[in-house]
């Protein structure tokens, strides 16, 4: 019962990606594409484990989880290449490419885009009041602003201190 309730709270992009993954899994099974099949199953398993752990069901959380999976695959491929295991490195590289395809399909802004928007936002605040305290800026960053930027509030808030120093301490 609770799983269905949690799925109800998921964002549309979250549900769309899950549907896409399930359709792609079925296609990979029909085509007998084992690489894609096992990678998609791994993605679905990781997402399910994240849901069980109580993770938010948003595109931002999915981006974080899938980004972590890509990083793990890239690191593993590098390790395998150092150990002269090119066969295993190739498998990890292919898996990371498959996962990247799904990360790119999410409507999430890149760090550069967020930084650019945040810089513009902070410059507007400075133009209105050059003595604005960083705490007041944190209060202005809410879920609505974050979703309109295509970013998680936590990602935006993690960038505020360094940009605040650059802009307000000039």
UniProtKB/Swiss-Prot annotation:
Its main location: mitochondrion. Coiled coil: none annotated. It is found in: Mitochondrion. SUPFAM superfamilies: GatB/YqeY motif. Keywords: Mitochondrion, Transit peptide. InterPro entries: Asn/Gln_tRNA_amidoTrase-B-like, YqeY/Aim41, YqeY/Aim41_N. GO terms for molecular function: carbon-nitrogen ligase activity, with glutamine as amido-N-donor. PANTHER family: ALTERED INHERITANCE OF MITOCHONDRIA PROTEIN 41, MITOCHONDRIAL. This is Altered inheritance of mitochondria protein 41, mitochondrial. It comes from Clavispora lusitaniae (strain ATCC 42720). The gene is AIM41.
């Amino acid at each position: 019962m609770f799983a269905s309730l949690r799925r109800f709270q998921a964002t549309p992009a979250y549900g769309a990606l899950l549907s896409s993954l399930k359709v792609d899994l079925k296609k990979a099974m029909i085509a007998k594409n084992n690489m894609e099949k096992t990678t998609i199953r791994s993605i679905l398993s990781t997402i399910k484990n994240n849901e069980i752990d109580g993770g938010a069901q948003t595109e931002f959380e999915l981006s974080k989880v899938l980004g972590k999976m890509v990083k793990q695959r890239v690191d593993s491929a590098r390790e395998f290449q150092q150990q002269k295991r090119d066969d295993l490195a190739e498998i990890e590289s292919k898996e990371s490419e498959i996962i990247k395809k799904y990360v790119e399909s999410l409507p999430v802004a890149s760090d550069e885009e967020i930084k650019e928007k945040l810089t513009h936002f902070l410059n507007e605040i400075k133009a209105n009041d050059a003595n604005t305290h960083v705490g007041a800026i944190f209060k202005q960053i809410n879920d609505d602003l974050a979703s309109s930027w295509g970013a998680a509030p936590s990602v935006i808030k993690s960038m505020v201190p360094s940009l605040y120093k650059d802009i307000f301490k000039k």
